[in-house]
Regions:
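A generic structural micro-feature
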Residues: 19-21, 95-101, 120-125
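A short coil-to-beta-strand element that immediately follows conserved catalytic motifs
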Residues: 76-87
Length: 176
């Protein structure tokens, strides 16, 4: 039984009413020359950025991002490093694809000492490279390309739907 406010009798939300939406998180990792770290996965075509799906055990998007980047590249962001949320993208479901929510974090730029320590997970990643943004965008798969392009344009937080900015969201609110 649900009450008028949508909660169950005990103040909980009935599980049947909750959407099952996959959440993933990716990372923009640059070198000091402004080149973006991109990866070639073994399990799908094209290039991507480091990141992956959030675990269902209560992991947060930021924790998923750190875990996936460490698993795929060996890079681990320490507690003292500052990253920023670059965008959040709502992907609509499509036939055979569940859709989901994608977080993209900008980890900033790293030096050769850090990036020289990249060790890819060969079961998942066949190759990596640092590419200037134009080249990286041309290699990335379309949904990721849109997200990265939007996130790097103006370096402001972006809300996207299917990889595209939503008119009226993210702009300055009108003064009233």
């Amino acid at each position: 039984m649900t009450t008028d406010d949508g909660f169950g009798a005990e103040g909980t939300i009935p599980d049947a009413d909750l959407p099952a939406i996959p959440v993933s998180a990716g990372a923009l990792v640059f070198d000091h020359a402004g080149r973006l770290l991109i990866l070639k996965p073994t399990y799908k075509s094209g290039w991507t950025i480091p990141g992956g799906v959030m675990e269902a055990d209560g992991e947060t998007p930021w924790e998923a991002c750190r875990r996936e980047v460490a698993e795929e590249t060996g890079l681990d962001i320490g507690a003292g490093h500052q990253a920023r949320l670059a965008c959040m993208d709502f992907r609509r479901p499509r036939p055979g694809k569940p859709g989901g929510i994608r977080f993209l974090f900008d980890w900033g730029a790293f030096g050769d000492a850090t990036l020289g320590g990249i060790v890819v997970q060969p079961e998942e990643i066949s190759e990596y490279r640092l590419a200037d943004l134009r080249t990286a965008l041309s290699l990335l798969r379309k949904p990721i390309r849109r997200r990265v392009r939007a996130a790097t344009r103006g370096r402001r937080l972006r809300y996207l739907e299917d990889g595209l900015p939503v008119p009226g969201v993210g702009e300055r609110p009108a003064r009233r």
